[in-house]
Amino acid sequence: MKQKGILLIAILFTLIISLAAADRAVLVKNSLTDINACQGKLKLKLIRVWGGDKEVDENKFFKTPRCVSLDKNGLLYICDMHSHCIKVFESISGNYVRTLGQFGKGPADLYAPETIALTTGGDIWVGENAGFRIQLFSPEGKSKKITKVKDMPEWIGVTSNNNLAIYFHDRAINTGKLIAIFNTDGKVLRDIGIYHDKSKNYIESIRLAFAIDNSDSIYSSYTSIPLIRKYSSDGVLLLAITFGYPFETEPVEIIPNEKGDEINIIRENNQESSVVQKNKRGIALQQMVRKSKPRVGAHVIGIDTQKRIYAVTVKRLPSEKERFAGAIYGGPNGLNRSRVNYDIVENIDIYRVLVFSPEGKVIAEAQIRGYCDSMYINGNRLFMVDGNINQRVLEYEMSFEQ
């Protein structure tokens, strides 16, 4: 009887430990050695270049492509922010089909569209950065619904039941909430994730990238911190991934919090110093000087149907010549670009793609050429959006080395 009692206590204790562990996110660390062992295991074959500043066909020219999506009928939607429209193409032939939207603030108009996402029924949600609204279009371009929002929508994901997962950068900074889940009537159902924990360490207004998988899990990555997080559809942090770099970066500590349900990011606060000098007239001029080492993270992320995680990261630091090869200046109707060297900006090789298993371990790597502002994965196709610098979308065929 005594042995049965001891056995029962042991089982109960194990169950308690298991339940506690179930609430804790898994932190997976990938070293530089792990990454180097996977070099070249992702094969990328360039299939087509969409757009580019040398494109002469007005229907195929983009001012600032921001993101793409492919529907079940093989139509490719390319969101062109500063042309204030969505251009639609046949993905196989490359032929132009139609344009959704034009500059304006009325129904079926668009004002600086930043992000798009397709519903299960084939409609298109568009987040208007300058319009402070999200708008639902039919595939033919008819406006079906408009929802006003308080902040600029910078990323939209559609769940399996057609709810919307939306990232508002200003809202995230002000509230600490990462993603808002809306129903189709524009009501906030819940929030998912935290922007960062300011009580532990203040992080400046850094940008993030997002993706959503076919189970409605949401992934986020910081552009200047080597951390990718995966949340369940109800907001539980399931996985956190870190990765090393082949050059010295700013020291950052990434650790689970006390409960294990979130990740704390700890780094030095004194990243800049103020230098005051006087000009010839004796007027004091203040200049901010950055003292820290480079800050790097995953600029862009994407998810395939097997829930493998793709992240665009920096492989090496740019040279001084590369840093000044191209410049961009914002304007109301687009970006003005100046290029000192076309070959550098079109073929720069400082970026690579890392692929992680659903469990968070790195499994493949590939070098890419050019810049990448966002990515989209459909089957064995990888679309890299190089919009800010080269005004184009690169379409690759993917395969993995066994």
Regions found by a protein language model. Give the residues of each.
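Bacterial N-terminal signal peptides that target proteins for export
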Residues: M1-L8
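Bacterial N-terminal signal peptides
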Residues: L8-I16
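Eukaryotic scaffold repeat domains enriched in small/polar residues
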Residues: A21-Q402
